[in-house]
Swiss-Prot record:
SUBUNIT field: May associate with the nuclear pore complex.
Region entry Disordered, spans: 306-325
Family in the record: Belongs to the NPIP family.
Gene behind this protein: NPIPA1
UniProt xrefs under PANTHER family: NUCLEAR PORE COMPLEX INTERACTING PROTEIN, NUCLEAR PORE COMPLEX-INTERACTING PROTEIN FAMILY MEMBER A1-RELATED
Predominant location: nucleus
Lineage of producing organism: Eukaryota, Metazoa, Chordata, Craniata, Vertebrata
Name recorded for this polypeptide: Nuclear pore complex-interacting protein family member A1
Localization of this protein: Nucleus, Nuclear pore complex; Nucleus membrane
Keyword Repeat tagged: no
Keyword Amino-acid biosynthesis on entry: no
Signal peptide: none
Keywords assigned by UniProt, alphabetized: Membrane, mRNA transport, Nuclear pore complex, Nucleus, Protein transport, Translocation, Transport
Length: 350
């Protein structure tokens, strides 16, 4: 309105609708927004009017109009920029943002519709299949019943799979427990065997066989010292009766040092012959052959306790029961004629 009045005053009162429209269009096209110093006609009005109040009112009205145009944009789409490319970029950016938002909504809606359509098509296929199958038997089912049965079957299958998995887990736990028990049992067995081996090693061989070892050693020494042929049964029984009552074999609680049965023969038994038995028997005429008495038998090299061939020439008489053969004596001439071997005595002592 003020623009029209100023134009009419400058032009001398000519008033046309076309001139007012041109002025409004130019102001709206070139100077939209907060461009306060770019209006040449405003400077012309302030210079020629020379009125302070009119200039203040004109500036105030212009500020109000610019503020209102800034808040409420015009419909023609002009943003006050003369750069066509910049305006095109801005418009394209806004249009692309809007298109992006719209496309996301469209895709979301399309997915929902597609899901519904697929479910409906599947339902129609199931209904058609069931109806075609049951048409032969004179039956007709709906898709809901078939789906219900399918869901029941799926539930039963899932329940069976769950039970099988639980059984497998329980079986694995049981096998693990059994394996643990087996390991514990094997460890206990190994400890028991080690303990048995330890106590078995602590028992001396003489404690395991208290009579055989000493009888054999005594028989060998008797054979070497007397020169008699080695007769194991006769010598063993004779020595057993001559030794008389012996203490019981030591148990595991006794130590090896305190063992009364030793594998060594005392030195006094090597020097002196065995004493005669208390009970004389009828076999007192058992004598050594003359050829064996003249030459003492040397000890064998391999110590295999074999009878010399010269002693095999004269057969020995049959032996009586063990109780009768207790008077086995060594002739004194054989004892006197035996050479003294200190090395053998040292070995026997060791």
């Amino acid at each position: 309105m003020f623009c029209c009045l100023g134009y009419e005053w400058l032009s001398g009162g000519c008033k046309t609708w076309h001139s007012a429209w041109v002025i409004n269009t130019l102001a709206d096209h070139r100077h939209r927004g907060t461009d306060f110093g770019g209006s040449p006609w405003l400077l012309i009005i302030t210079v020629f009017l020379r009125s302070y109040k009119f200039a203040i009112s004109l500036c105030t009205s212009y500020l109000c109009v610019s503020f209102l145009k800034t808040i409420f944009p015009s419909q023609n789409g002009h943003d006050g920029s003369t750069d066509v490319q910049q305006r095109a970029r801005r418009s394209n950016r806004r249009r692309q943002e809007g298109i992006k938002i719209v496309l996301e909504d469209i895709f979301t809606l399309w997915r929902q519709v597609e899901t519904k359509v697929r479910a409906k098509i599947r339902k129609m296929k199931v209904t058609t299949k069931v109806n075609r199958h049951d048409k032969i038997n004179g039956k007709r089912k709906t898709a809901k019943e078939h789906l219900r049965k399918l869901s029941m079957k799926e539930r039963e299958h899932g329940e069976k799979e769950r039970q099988v998995s639980e059984a497998e887990e329980n079986g694995k736990l049981d096998m693990k427990e059994i394996h643990t028990y087996m390991e514990m049992f094997q460890r206990a067995q190994a400890l028991r065997r080690r303990a048995e081996d330890y106590y078995r090693c602590k028992i001396t061989p003489s404690a395991r066989k208290p009579l055989c070892n000493r009888v054999r050693m005594a028989a060998v020494e008797h054979r070497h010292s007397s020169g008699l042929p080695y007769w194991p049964y006769l010598t063993a029984e004779t020595l057993k009766n001559r030794m008389g009552h012996q203490p019981p074999p030591p148990t595991q609680q006794h130590s090896i040092i305190d063992n009364s049965l030793s594998l060594k023969t005392p030195s006094e038994c090597l020097l002196t012959p065995l004493p005669p038995s208390a009970l004389p028997s009828a076999d007192d005429n058992l004598k050594t052959p003359a050829e064996c008495l003249l030459y003492p038998l040397p000890p064998s090299a391999d110590d295999n306790l074999k009878t010399p061939p010269e002693c095999l020439l004269t057969p020995l008489p049959p032996s009586a029961p063990p109780s009768v053969d207790d008077n086995l004596k060594t002739p004194p001439e054989c004892v006197c004629s035996l050479p003294f071997h200190p090395q053998r005595m040292i070995i026997s002592r060791n």
